[in-house]
Design a protein with these regions (language model features):
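Conserved catalytic-core motifs of GNAT/GCN5-like acyltransferases
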Residues: 3, 9-14, 89, 97, ...
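Acetyl-CoA-dependent GNAT
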Residues: 13-14, 50, 54-112, 123-124, ...
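A short beta-loop-alpha structural element at the N-terminal edge
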Residues: 27-40
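Conserved active-site tyrosine of GNAT-family acetyltransferases
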Residues: 44, 153, 158, 185
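Conserved beta-strand-loop-alpha-helix junction that forms the acyl-donor binding cleft
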Residues: 114, 140-150
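Conserved acetyl-CoA-binding loop-helix of GNAT-fold acetyltransferases
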Residues: 115-130, 151-155
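Conserved GNAT acetyl-CoA-binding A-motif
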Residues: 130-142
Length: 194
């Protein structure tokens, strides 16, 4: 993985290759790079269209996406043929030094790969690389209706912090015009700052 500290490379390496339950082929987790962007953008757009993934109404361009997410906190999951099955990325929650170890993550899995353990592999890779980089808290903001994502995050140690009531108004999809609640979850490092 180019451009990442060696510890991050080592932390991510343990999750690959892996055969998800119900999946016919091994899945490789790698650093998300610009060459993956067309597939990542498509998966992002598919998630947006469901109305259950984000308030965003369209994916950003590569430059905007990459600018806010450090390379060592961006990963893709690919099958043996190199097809991108999903992605995860995290960005700092604040520029203030006191929050230097706090990030917010997003994880998206292509519908054809849902239920095969891809999301779990991606979040495990992010957790490992985040801890290797000194991150002590990973936050996730999830719509209450997205029960699969809530369950996945809780299985990996994310705990509900609270509900942000009517956090934003949807501009698109099946919930267009509605004010939506978001559940805030966080995963606190067991090794950093404990």
């Amino acid at each position: 993985m180019s451009g990442t500290p060696p510890l991050v490379d080592d932390a991510v390496r343990w999750v690959r290759p892996h055969t998800p339950r119900g999946g016919p082929s091994a899945v490789t987790v790698a650093e998300l790079q610009e060459r993956h962007w067309p597939a990542v953008r498509e998966i992002y757009a598919t998630g947006i269209a469901t109305g259950q993934a984000t308030f965003e109404s369209q994916p950003p361009d590569w430059a905007r996406f990459a600018a806010g997410k450090p390379a060592h906190l961006r990963h893709v999951a690919m099958d043996e043929g190199g097809t991108v099955l999903g992605w995860v990325a995290a960005s700092p929650v604040s520029a203030r030094p006191v929050y230097a170890g706090v990030v917010e993550e997003s994880v998206y899995v292509h519908p054809s790969a849902a239920g095969r353990g891809v999301g779990r592999l991606l979040l495990q890779a992010l957790i490992a690389s985040a801890e290797a980089a000194g991150v002590w808290t990973i936050e996730a903001k999830i719509f209450p209706e997205n029960t699969a994502s809530l369950a996945l995050h809780q299985k990996l140690g994310f705990e509900p912090v609270g509900v942000r009531r009517r956090l934003g108004r949807m501009s698109h999809g099946p919930h267009a015009g509605q004010w939506r609640d978001v559940i805030l979850l966080e995963r606190r490092s067991a090794t950093i700052g404990s």
